[in-house]
């Protein structure tokens, strides 16, 4: 069965490891085995792709870096082979304000929060208090 596996993408937090924790030894051994069998291994995360994500393999003492990273839930993709990050067109702050103004009744009723990412800066803010 393992011979058929060509690519593996795994979420980081609470999948490969507990938040900010080292990888369990069994996970390290499994990833090394897949890497030795030439399986392309990547990370998938809701976070923006930064140098921290690009060096997770060494941080976790795998002996190799991940082949690719899917960031911002698909909004960014890093290809190690090309050493290039591809990004989707993101909404501008002005476009975001327009959409959120339209949705304000729901936002206020449900007490919705939003995760805004960009330029390697991540802020969690309450839309009704901080953005509009």
Please give the residue ranges for each predicted region.
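A generic hydrophobic-segment detector
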Residues: 4, 131-132
């Amino acid at each position: 069965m393992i011979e058929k596996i060509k690519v593996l993408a795994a979420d980081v937090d609470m999948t490969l490891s507990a938040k900010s924790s080292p990888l369990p030894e069994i996970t390290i051994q499994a990833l090394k085995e897949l890497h030795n069998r030439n399986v392309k291994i990547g990370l998938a995360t809701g976070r923006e792709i930064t140098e921290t994500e690009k060096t997770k393999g060494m941080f976790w003492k795998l002996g190799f870096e991940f082949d690719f990273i899917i960031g911002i839930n698909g909004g960014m993709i890093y290809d190690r082979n090309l050493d290039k990050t591809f990004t989707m067109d993101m909404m501008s702050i002005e476009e975001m304000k327009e959409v959120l103004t339209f949705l304000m009744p729901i936002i206020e009723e449900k007490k919705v929060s939003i995760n805004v990412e960009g330029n390697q800066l991540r802020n969690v803010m309450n839309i009704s208090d901080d953005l509009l």
